[in-house]
Amino acid sequence: METATIIVIFVSSLLLGITTYSVYTAFGPASKNLRDPFEEHED
Protein backbone atom coordinates (compact mmCIF):
# COMPACT_ATOMS: atom_id res chain seq x y z
CA MET A 1 0.00 0.00 0.00
CA GLU A 2 1.05 3.56 -0.46
CA THR A 3 2.01 5.74 2.45
CA ALA A 4 -0.88 8.15 1.88
CA THR A 5 -3.42 5.32 2.04
CA ILE A 6 -2.00 4.07 5.33
CA ILE A 7 -2.07 7.58 6.81
CA VAL A 8 -5.68 8.13 5.71
CA ILE A 9 -6.76 4.79 7.21
CA PHE A 10 -4.93 5.57 10.46
CA VAL A 11 -6.42 9.07 10.83
CA SER A 12 -9.92 7.82 9.95
CA SER A 13 -9.65 5.01 12.50
CA LEU A 14 -8.40 7.42 15.14
CA LEU A 15 -11.28 9.86 14.57
CA LEU A 16 -13.82 7.03 14.59
CA GLY A 17 -12.37 5.68 17.83
CA ILE A 18 -12.46 9.08 19.53
CA THR A 19 -16.04 9.65 18.37
CA THR A 20 -17.15 6.20 19.57
CA TYR A 21 -15.49 6.70 22.95
CA SER A 22 -17.07 10.14 23.45
CA VAL A 23 -20.55 8.85 22.57
CA TYR A 24 -20.06 5.91 24.95
CA THR A 25 -18.93 8.30 27.70
CA ALA A 26 -21.86 10.65 27.11
CA PHE A 27 -24.65 8.05 26.85
CA GLY A 28 -23.24 4.81 28.30
CA PRO A 29 -23.31 3.49 31.86
CA ALA A 30 -20.65 5.98 32.96
CA SER A 31 -22.93 8.91 32.09
CA LYS A 32 -24.69 8.60 35.46
CA ASN A 33 -21.48 9.79 37.15
CA LEU A 34 -21.24 12.95 35.04
CA ARG A 35 -22.36 16.14 36.72
CA ASP A 36 -24.78 18.52 35.04
CA PRO A 37 -23.98 22.16 35.82
CA PHE A 38 -27.42 23.27 34.62
CA GLU A 39 -29.16 21.03 37.16
CA GLU A 40 -26.87 22.25 39.95
CA HIS A 41 -27.69 25.89 39.26
CA GLU A 42 -31.20 26.69 40.42
CA ASP A 43 -32.61 30.19 39.96
Swiss-Prot record:
Lineage top rank: taxon = Eukaryota
- Location in or out of the cell: Plastid, Chloroplast thylakoid membrane
GO biological process per UniProt: photosynthesis
Q: What is this protein called?
A: Protein PsbN
Q: Which residues cross the membrane?
A: 7-29
Look up the record and report any one GO term of the cellular component aspect: chloroplast thylakoid membrane
Membrane topology label: Single-pass membrane protein
Similarity annotation: Belongs to the PsbN family.
Return the PANTHER family for the record: PROTEIN PSBN (PTHR35326:SF3)
Q: Which Pfam families match?
A: PsbN (PF02468)
Q: Which UniProt keywords apply?
A: Chloroplast, Membrane, Plastid, Thylakoid, Transmembrane, Transmembrane helix
Q: What does this protein do?
A: May play a role in photosystem I and II biogenesis.
- Kindly report the protein's main subcellular placement as a broad class: plastid
